[in-house]
């Protein structure tokens, strides 16, 4: 138990007390103090003059950034740390929430700890030159994560990486997907948190095993990072040592804690957590005391959201191929239901979504509604209304996640749930199941290069592919792949902890935490449809002069995933369960728990490039379907049948998430807005009751996207949902835009 002081008494005045006063327990604080809101959106306030002026400035900077080839400015000398840069502002006189990553908004930081080669490549991609002294330091004197990984990789791992049977690995970029509990800084102040870490350090085991030594060093780094966080606050004129005393301070304290994380790390997903209900407690207290108005509350939220929209990292061209459109995954989880049955919806839940009106649509922050059939009807209707209007919201099934994670979890990146401040993950990208099937047919040889990448066993020699024979070899190939995959991830995360440790994010966790090893699969629908074709049609392999199977001839029809047909849907379910079982047989770094996702981001295009012709009729180089989606155009029985197929994928085997991106034309939801809202709400309820996990919802016509592709200057804020995140459509590459346009747009329910 830690001692509190008069600062805490002042900051906590009017709050209901509990264990949270003596120990870090943000969840209990929320449960004791939040105010459920079941009303409608009529209380919401429009943008203030300051908000409109600031957003005009952001839009002008965004325009200049596009005109400069995607990079407004970049630091090429100073390695980014929590305290590396002076304070920066958009307009100090107008901003209610302040802080940017460098001394100027839109100037991107240089983050070499993950890999100096990547930092250099990011500079050169935009016409900048990395400072010679900085390059020398991180080449000759300070080893990086990337160098450590490649020092330890085996030849087999390198071959799999090059061929693309495992790809997107976080060995050349920050792993991300760790959510610091940034709320702790607002509630307790940094001094309280430092005392807690020192207490843990002084009371832990002194039996110096390797695990104990590592944890003691990590705690020392966490303590140091918290001290630097106070210095960051001082740069902006704030005393973060004490807890926040009002709503504005609570938002500012929380944001500066998040800012420290994104100054120190450039992880693929730097998610925010679950902040709206927590912050609403402060807003309600100030509103009741008459010290703030609703318009002022909304202005502070809008300025906070504005800061989250301009989070930026310098990325390499290879990274941008995998994760297109400059995403940062500042994921904020909104809503959900408590384990006591009370919805966690507050007025702030509305205010966060209302920023899409006040500032216009945007991909960041990645607004994620934790959907439950028990959410208040007015909130459900408002969510549907904003989805139809902006296509900027994703939905995740709180009713199935709450069973595993309780009621204070957040979403990291796209679809990965974790209990805030008590759990982190080792992000693991994806294994390519479609390509693995081709390896089974070709005896471990790569269908594109002819190289022996997989184990060297006899391939399929028959003139017609026979299901049992193919599946037996496929099963053996998945055994091999699971081992190489887990071992690769063990190397990556050992080195990331060693050379690019997330000090401030982990300082905002409990000392003892749950770790997961978050694997993933790509090409699920391609593999399932391919096996269905082999089983129900006649598939003849076509070989080249070396005897390598390079194409297929299909005679007859076959069931296709996405039409609520158990004959093929059961194949998809079996593949997920089977591969997860194989992964679990391998030991993980730090005894992390195995999890898996069915998620591709926009890398479905890259996976397609890496994969040859497949037995389902997909041609070499064609993109895979994103995430757990059916292949483009194959879900022909309407929206509900498509959703039903995806909902069969078992969440118990895919606790890292099952991504489904769903596009529907407005008229199919109804003629009148009220009908559209009601039908979309009913569809979400039905999907949740079927145990579907995740749904990106796009509501627009294909013609809109085609026009935006031809006239991007007219669509600066056109936002679409892709696999697990949102993106400005005009920031996608032409190839990725065409991929999105080619996907199924449901014209009937």
From Swiss-Prot:
Transmembrane segments: none
Keywords, comma-separated and alphabetical: Acyltransferase, Carbohydrate metabolism, Cytoplasm, Glucose metabolism, Organic radical, Transferase
Subcellular compartments: Cytoplasm
Glycine radical domain boundaries: 626-749
InterPro entries recorded: Auton_GlycylRad_Cofactor (IPR050244), Form_AcTrfase (IPR005949), Form_AcTrfase_GR_CS (IPR019777), Gly_radical (IPR001150), PFL_dom (IPR004184)
Sample GO molecular function, one term: formate C-acetyltransferase activity
Annotated catalysed reactions: formate + acetyl-CoA = pyruvate + CoA
PROSITE patterns reported for this sequence: GLY_RADICAL_1 (PS00850), GLY_RADICAL_2 (PS51149), PFL (PS51554)
Residue positions where Glycine radical is found in the record: 724
Pathway assignment: Fermentation; pyruvate fermentation; formate from pyruvate: step 1/1
Gene Ontology, cellular component aspect: cytosol
A single GO BP: glucose metabolic process
Pfam families: Gly_radical, PFL-like
Chief subcellular location: cytoplasm
Activity regulation information from UniProt: Activated by pfl-activating enzyme under anaerobic conditions via generation of an organic free radical. Exposure of activated pfl to oxygen results in a cleavage at the glycine residue harboring its organic radical with loss of the 25 C-terminal amino acids.
The organism's place on the tree of life at top rank: Bacteria
Statement: the UniProt record of this protein carries the keyword Electron transport: no
Other notes: Several mechanisms have been proposed based on complexes formed with substrate analogs. After activation by the glycine radical, the cysteine radical, Cys-414, can abstract hydrogen atoms from the other active site cysteine, Cys-413, and from coenzyme A, and it can also transfer hydrogen atoms to product radicals. The other active site cysteine can attack the central carbonyl of pyruvate and covalently bind the product acetyl group.
Protein name, entry field: Formate acetyltransferase
Taxonomic lineage from the root: Bacteria, Bacillati, Bacillota, Bacilli, Bacillales
Gene: pflB
């Amino acid at each position: 138990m830690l001692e509190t002081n008069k600062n805490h008494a002042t900051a906590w005045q009017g709050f209901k007390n509990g264990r949270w006063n003596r120990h870090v327990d943000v969840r209990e604080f929320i449960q004791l103090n939040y105010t459920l809101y079941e009303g409608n959106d009529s209380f919401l306030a429009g943008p203030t003059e300051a908000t409109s002026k600031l957003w005009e400035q952001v839009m002008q900077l965004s325009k200049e950034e596009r005109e400069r080839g995607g990079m407004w400015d970049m630091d090429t000398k100073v390695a980014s740390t929590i305290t590396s840069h002076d304070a920066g502002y958009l307009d100090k006189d107008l901003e209610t929430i302040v802080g940017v990553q460098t001394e100027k908004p839109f100037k991107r930081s240089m983050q070499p700890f993950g890999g100096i080669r990547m930092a250099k490549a990011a500079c050169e991609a935009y016409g900048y030159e990395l400072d010679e002294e900085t390059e020398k330091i991180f080449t000759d004197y300070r080893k990086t994560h990337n160098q450590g990984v490649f020092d330890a990789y085996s030849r087999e791992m390198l071959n799999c990486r090059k061929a693309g049977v495992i790809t997107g690995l976080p060995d050349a970029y920050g792993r991300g997907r760790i959510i610091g509990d940034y709320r702790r800084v607002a509630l307790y102040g940094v001094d309280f948190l430092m005392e807690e870490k020192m207490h843990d350090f002084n009371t832990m085991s002194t039996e110096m095993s390797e695990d104990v030594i590592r944890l003691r060093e990590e705690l020392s780094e966490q303590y140091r990072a918290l001290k630097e966080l106070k210095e960051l606050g001082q740069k902006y004129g704030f005393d973060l040592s004490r807890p926040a005393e009002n709503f504005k301070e609570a938002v500012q304290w929380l944001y500066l804690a998040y800012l420290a994380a994104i100054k120190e790390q450039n992880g693929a997903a730097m998610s925010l957590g679950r902040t709206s209900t927590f912050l609403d407690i402060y807003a309600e207290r100030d509103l009741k005391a008459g010290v703030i108005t609703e318009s002022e509350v909304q202005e502070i939220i809008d300025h906070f959201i504005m800061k989250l929209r301009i989070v930026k990292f310098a990325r390499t061209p290879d990274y941008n191929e995998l994760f297109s459109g400059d995403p940062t995954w500042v994921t904020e989880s909104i809503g959900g239901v408590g384990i006591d049955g009370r919805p966690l919806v507050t007025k702030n839940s509305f205010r966060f979504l209302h920023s899409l009106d006040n500032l216009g649509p945007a991909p960041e922050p990645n607004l994620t509604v934790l959907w439950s059939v028990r959410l208040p009807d007015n909130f459900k209707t408002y969510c549907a209304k904003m989805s139809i209007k902006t296509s900027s919201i994703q939905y995740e099934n709180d009713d199935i996640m709450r069973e595993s994670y309780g009621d204070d979890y957040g979403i990291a990146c796209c679809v990965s749930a974790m209990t805030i401040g008590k759990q982190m993950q080792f992000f693991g990208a994806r294994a390519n199941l479609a390509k693995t099937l081709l390896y089974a047919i070709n005896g471990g040889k790569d269908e594109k290069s002819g190289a022996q990448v997989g184990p060297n066993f006899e391939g399929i020699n028959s003139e017609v592919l026979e299901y049992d024979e193919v599946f037996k070899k496929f099963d053996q190939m998945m055994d091999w792949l699971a081992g190489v995959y887990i071992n690769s991830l063990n190397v990556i995360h050992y080195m990331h902890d060693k050379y690019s440790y997330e000090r401030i994010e982990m300082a905002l966790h409990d000392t003892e935490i749950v770790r997961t090893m978050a694997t993933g699969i790509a090409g699920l629908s391609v593999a399932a449809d391919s096996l269905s074709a082999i089983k129900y049609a006649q598939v003849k392999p076509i070989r080249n002069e070396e005897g390598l199977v390079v194409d297929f001839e299909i005679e007859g029809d076959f069931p296709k995933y996405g039409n609520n047909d158990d004959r093929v849907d059961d194949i998809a379910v079996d593949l997920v369960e089977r591969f997860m079982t194989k992964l679990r047989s391998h030991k993980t770094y730090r005894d992390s728990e195995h999890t898996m996702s069915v998620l591709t981001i926009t890398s479905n295009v890259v996976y397609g490039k890496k994969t040859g012709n497949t037995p389902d009729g997909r041609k070499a180089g064609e993109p895979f379907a994103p995430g757990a989606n059916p292949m483009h155009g194959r879900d022909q029985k309407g929206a509900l049948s498509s959703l039903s197929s995806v909902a069969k994928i078992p969440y118990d085997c895919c606790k890292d998430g099952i991504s489904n991106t769903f596009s529907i034309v407005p008229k199919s939801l109804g003629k009148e807005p009220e009908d559209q809202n009601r039908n979309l709400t009913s569809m979400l309820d039905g999907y949740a009751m079927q145990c579907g996990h995740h749904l990106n919802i796009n509501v627009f016509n294909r013609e809109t996207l085609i026009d935006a592709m031809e006239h991007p200057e007219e669509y600066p804020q056109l936002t679409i949902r892709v696999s697990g995140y949102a993106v400005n459509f005009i920031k996608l590459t032409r190839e990725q835009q065409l991929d999105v346009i080619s996907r199924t747009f449901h014209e009937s329910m």
